[in-house]
A protein has these predicted regions:
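Terminal-tail/helix-coil boundary detector
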Residues: 382-405
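Alpha-amylase-like alpha-glycosidases and glucanotransferases acting on alpha-linked glucans and related
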Residues: 1-101, 126-351, 355-356, 361-362, ...
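Conserved, well-ordered alpha-helix/loop/beta-strand core segments that scaffold catalytic motifs
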Residues: 93-126
């Protein structure tokens, strides 16, 4: 039994799908015009996705590269047989998506009606075991056997001596360019409908991406390669116009990345914790008095410790510098003082995590990179956000011009 402030994904996986399957079969037992319309409108991605997931079920979850060669290679006869043999399970997976988006659209309409916008995340890469790689292998750097030639990651730095080996397949940008990056255009256009604002993860890979030979033990043998650059964003603007996009431009940032960010017109990100991190030579870029107006400022992202947690887990010298710079005091609350540092800056948008508003410690951090145990499990409890906190937040927003009184 998990504590109430933690999501137990294992239990949900075991208990939720049998119930969902019953609901899906019940929906499929009678005509449903709304479901049919959803399938027709979203068939461009839904058909391959549902087939892929039905095949995963039939293969007991085995990764797609371990399937039999005919279906792994999407041979015509094997695809036809799968569509016939797994027709019901394919339809069930389509119902799951229909139910999700029906609920999501209702939630989004509700919060938009309150004047709230939703920022969604667009991961730069997809998993090797994904419908994208299986259905459109020509878009990725794969060999004749369907294995990645190189995979994604980050080079060694002050935070990791061997770098980060993510393992995702890399895009074949030259091939993608031949049809005007249509796969990417469709992805971005669709997600801009799902969310109000889109944050593109690992923006620097559009300028240069790090390629690590497949099978490497760590990221150290990797090399930087040229990405699609300005041409990608020129085509994006031509096809889709001005879009509400935030660029995650953290990490190893070069002059060419900064130039691409300026040309794209997207605001970049500033992380307050990085301003005081003695391991990071880029600290001055993250100190509030150096912020440009056109940026989005955070105390920390989902990959960082909470504000209160950082005060106890960071190097003592880093914490002392933050205390001096922001005049932090226990009376105000260290976490509240860090938020004040953001709100009083010129950044046009600031983001604080729910955990920081509540003053929670490291036990409530959302994600610890390179670990898999307790990530993305924290959730707030009923009553955590009370009227007293709302009034305090409101006064701060008025004081720093974040809202009008």
């Amino acid at each position: 039994e998990s504590p109430p402030d933690r999501v137990n994904y294992g239990a949900l996986y075991q208990k939720r799908y049998p119930v969902l399957r019953k609901a899906a079969l019940r929906l499929l037992s009678q005509p449903n015009a709304s479901f049919d319309a959803f399938c027709n409108e979203n068939g461009w991605w839904l058909d391959d996705y549902a087939l892929f997931m039905a095949l995963k079920d039939a293969e007991n979850g085995r990764p797609s590269w371990e399937w039999e060669a005919p279906i792994r290679r999407r041979e015509e006869g094997a695809l036809a047989a799968a569509l016939e043999n797994y027709a019901q399970q394919i339809a069930v997976w389509k119902v799951y998506q229909y139910l999700f988006f029906r609920q999501w659209d209702a939630l989004k309409a509700y919060v938009n009606g309150l004047g709230i916008q939703i920022i969604g995340d667009l991961p730069i890469y997809v998993s090797r075991d994904s419908v994208d790689v299986w259905a459109t292998p020509s878009l990725f750097q794969l060999d004749e056997n369907g294995n990645p030639v190189d995979v994604a990651g980050c080079p060694p730095d002050g935070f990791s001596a061997t770098g980060q080996l993510w393992g995702n397949p890399l895009y074949d940008w030259d091939h993608m360019a031949q049809d005007g990056y249509s796969w990417w255009m469709g992805r971005i256009e669709y997600l801009c409908k799902v969310y109000d604002v889109l944050r593109i993860d690992h923006f620097r890979a559009f300028d240069e991406y790090y390629a690590i030979p497949f099978g490497s033990a760590d990221a150290s043998p990797g090399r930087w390669r040229t990405g699609p650059g300005k041409n990608f964003f020129r085509i994006l603007k031509e096809k889709l116009g001005e879009l509400p996009i935030i660029a995650e431009d953290l990490g190893f940032v070069t002059d060419s990345v900064r130039e691409l960010l300026r040309d794209s017109g997207c605001p970049g990100m500033k992380v307050l914790q990085f301003a005081f991190d003695s391991r990071d030579s880029g600290g001055p870029n993250y100190i509030p008095h150096n912020y440009p107006t056109h940026c989005v400022a955070y105390i920390g992202t989902h990959d960082n410790d909470t504000a209160a947690g950082w005060m106890t887990s960071a190097a003592p010298g880093d914490v002392e510098e933050a205390v001096r710079y922001l005049n932090l005091t226990p009376e105000e609350g260290y976490h509240w003082g860090l938020m004040r540092g953001l709100w009083s800056s010129v950044a046009e948008l600031t983001v604080v995590q729910a955990q920081d508003l509540l003053g929670l410690g490291s036990e409530s951090r959302m994600n610890t990179p390179s670990t898999m145990e307790t990530n993305w499990q924290w959730r707030s409890l009923p009553g955590a956000f009370d009227d007293q906190l709302a009034q305090k937040l409101y006064r701060s927003m008025v004081r720093y011009g974040r809202i009008k009184e």
